[in-house]
Each structure stands twice: as C-alpha cells, then as structure tokens.
Amino acid sequence: MNKKIRVRYAPSPTGLLHIGNARTALFNYLFARHHGGDFIIRIEDTDRERHVEDGERSQLENLRWLGMDWDESPETHENYRQSERLPLYQKYIDQLLAEGKAYYSYKTPEELEADHAKQEAAGIPPHYINEYAGMSDDEKAAYIAERKAQNIEPVVRISVDEKAIYKWNDIVKGEIEFEGGNIGGDWVIQKRDGYPTYNFAVVVDDHDMQISHVIRGDDHIANTPKQLVVYDALGWEAPQFGHMTLIINSETGKKLSKRDTNTLQFIEDYRKKGYMSDAIFNFIALLGWNPGGEKEIFSREELIELFDENRLSKSPAAFDQKKLDWMDNEYIKNADFAKVFELTKPFLLAANRFDERAQELVKLYQPQMKSADEVVELTDLFYGDFPELTDEAREMLAAETTPLALSTFRAKLAELPESDFTVENIFPLFKATQKETGVKGKMLWMPIRIAASGSMHGPELPETIALLGKEKVLAHLDAALNK
C-alpha cells in the first residue's frame, strides 16, 4: 500500500460500547497497527437528540480496557468532535450552494410524509420529489418567498444524478454498485437546525483527516453511494471502503439485536462480570476474521502480526456466548494468580467473603471460573447451606458400595488432628480407603465428592476437603450416611 494508512473509529456518544462497535474499532485498530498506520478516534455527536451524558468517556474507557490505544483523538487534538467542526461543514455546504450542486428545500415533514405514503401505495420505493420541478424562475422565487413568510426553515439538499453509477471495490465484498436513481433522490446534507447530516459530515471529516480506508459494518453499505455523491460534488478522492458482515446470534441465527436481553452485548457488562480484557479482545478479533488453522487463542501482538484484511469473512459472524465463556476460562486458568485474585476481589468483598480463606479458595476455583463473578457461586459451599443434590447425585449415593466407602473414609479423616488436616495428609486416605474396602475409581471418589461438597463436579477433592475443614466435612459425611 503506497498511501499512508489512516483509519478511524467514529462512535456516537449515544450509549455504551456494543460488541458490534467494539469489533469495528478492533478491526480498524488491527489494520492500522499491522500496516504501521494511524488509528484515529473521532466523535460523531451531531445527533443531539440521542446524545448521552458521559457517553464519550464511556466509549473511550471501554476501548482502553480492551487494550486499544490510538494516535489521535479528542483528548489530544482539537476539533475531533463533529460539534466542534460546524464552521468547516458550513464552508463546504456554502461551496456546493454557490456551485449549484446543492439547494435549499422548503418541503415540510408533513408534505414529505404524504409524498412517501403515495409512493408506498403505488409500490414505488420512497424518494424525494424535487419541489422545484417544472417551475419557472419567477414561480420558484414566489414559492420560496411564500415559504419564508410562513417561517418554514429550509434544509439543504445535494443534487443527485439519477443516471450516474456509484461503485467501489469493497475490501470485503468486492465490486458493489448503485444506480443514482436508487438512493432516494436528492438527500439532505444540512438539517433545519443547521447541523450537517451524518452522510455529509463523515465525508468532510474523512477527507480533512486524510482517512485512507473506511472499515465498518455492512449496515453502512447503503450510505456509501450517498457519500460518493459528496466526494464527486466536491472533487475529492474517496477512501477505500470495506464492509464487515453482520454479527448473528449463534442460537437463533438472527442478527444480534440490542433488544435481545438474553445475551450480554455491551463491553461494560463483561467488565462488570469480571471477564478478562485479553479474552474479549481475542474473541472479538475472531468475529468475522480468521488467520487460518485450528488455533484460537492469540495474544494482542500475534493478532496484530497476523491480521490480513483479505481474510475478512463474507459470511455472517456468529456470536457464541458459550465460546466466549470457554475462551475466558482459558485465559483465567492460565493467568497469573495475582491477576485473577485481583479480578475476583470486588466480588468477594461484595459477598462479604474476603477473609483468611479467600486466596486459597480463588486458587482452588481458578481453573473452573468462566468469569470472575462466578467466584461467589463457586464458593457458596464454604459459606452457605449444603446444596440440593441432583437426582443423578442421589442415585450415586444410593449405590451398594457407598456406605462402606463413606464410613471408612470418614473414620480415617476423623483420626487426623486439626493441625494435620492438610491436602498432603488427606490425599493418601483415598488410597488407604480403596485398599481396605476394595471400592475404587469412580465408585470411591464420586460418592465422597458428593457427600462432602454436594456436587458431582468441582476442583481437586483433597483441596476442597482441606479448605472445608474437618468439622464441616465430617458433618457432611455423617449427613450422607444417615440418609
């Protein structure tokens, strides 16, 4: 690539960072870092009605948590918010008006709605009907004077050549083209309140910031021909466009929707649950891109080195919560204990479980945790009531050999002094019980696990027994034997 690579992530401060937007930011980040280019953050805040207080800070904070850094942003550069760039937009709107490539439109919202209703009834795609069509200069002047007298604020529309073909070679999807007659007619570039529309402002910004590549979701494909109209009108070279496929829910096969409350979709949600940022970074990087091969766990450095825009998928990317949980578990169990302990600390404190056993319990359950907040549920056995047994667990306890195995193991545990109730001393008791009773394998350790912990699954059994303590374990075994 001969041109300096400059890409941008341009969020609107309208809420929390969504998985889909995080992917857009991440792919732009990987693309820039792989090619030694610039990654730019720009805030698109022209939609004042949807503006959320603190939305910008939240976006940047969550991007940082994911591990992204950037070269330019509103934090370091002036006029990187659209609301700060209004004079620049006005300059180019005035230029287009002066050149006859744009014009004031006085049609009211009610008139536009009536036009669209007629078009819909006739089976015609909605498009703007030029209000000046067929008017003489005098008629046009009279029409404008009448509208001004009624205090109707105009919008500014850009003229679209309906016979033109707007096409580009998409980085992801290949050749795409639109006929000028299929993009809705002359469209608004400046609203009644004086603010530019998205499709106009984004072109001015991308040109002004020398953006070389625009990588975004394929919901923006329909915006691209409109933006090309502006590039043509102003005589500017357009950047290369790439439109990533949508993200679908792996269970429903439908587009991931913010209304789907059964799926966590905001980065903030994963932060609050104690997911590891490295895992989320890794997972999102594979939503619609794959370096090839079977490997799925990659460091940030590996992802930057391997990233290839030519391997962006043309098929929808499946968001699989179970896959994400598996990946986070891989990161947690392989992370330094100190890091995992720090991650679990807020949850232990909130549950009033940050006591002398906290470190040992986190160490015990680190291999099992899919997110740090699970530490509370996993440690319930040590602080709450004995769990309700499943039917399968009850069936195992009802086995013919269970009473002998449990009573023998209990007797051996009872002989251990409190000071010797350690993993090193508990571990040999399983073999001793097997030797004495002839009960072995699953028929030995599974009933003991169920009786001691109330579960058929869990961390290493000797460690669990040692941490539960002699008194509690003996009480649990007695309860099982007396049923």
Curated annotation (Swiss-Prot):
What the entry lists under CDD domains is as follows:
GluRS_core
Intracellular or extracellular location(s): Cytoplasm
| Residues spanned by motif 'HIGH' region | 11-21
- The EC designation for this entry is 6.1.1.17
Tell me the residue numbers annotated for binding ATP: K258
Judged by the first EC level, this protein's enzyme class is ligase
Source organism's superkingdom?
Bacteria
**KW Repeat (keyword) present:** no
Please classify the protein's predominant subcellular localization into one broad category: cytoplasm
CC per GO annotation: cytosol
The protein's annotated catalytic reaction(s) are: tRNA(Glu) + L-glutamate + ATP = L-glutamyl-tRNA(Glu) + AMP + diphosphate
Alphabetical UniProt keywords: Aminoacyl-tRNA synthetase, ATP-binding, Cytoplasm, Ligase, Nucleotide-binding, Protein biosynthesis
Q: List the Gene Ontology MF annotations in alphabetical order.
A: ATP binding; glutamate-tRNA ligase activity; tRNA binding; zinc ion binding
Look up the record and give one Gene Ontology term from the biological process aspect.
glutamyl-tRNA aminoacylation
Describe, as the record does, how this protein assembles with itself and its partners. Answer: Monomer.
What biological function has been recorded for the protein in this entry? Catalyzes the attachment of glutamate to tRNA(Glu) in a two-step reaction: glutamate is first activated by ATP to form Glu-AMP and then transferred to the acceptor end of tRNA(Glu).
Q: What is this protein called?
A: Glutamate--tRNA ligase
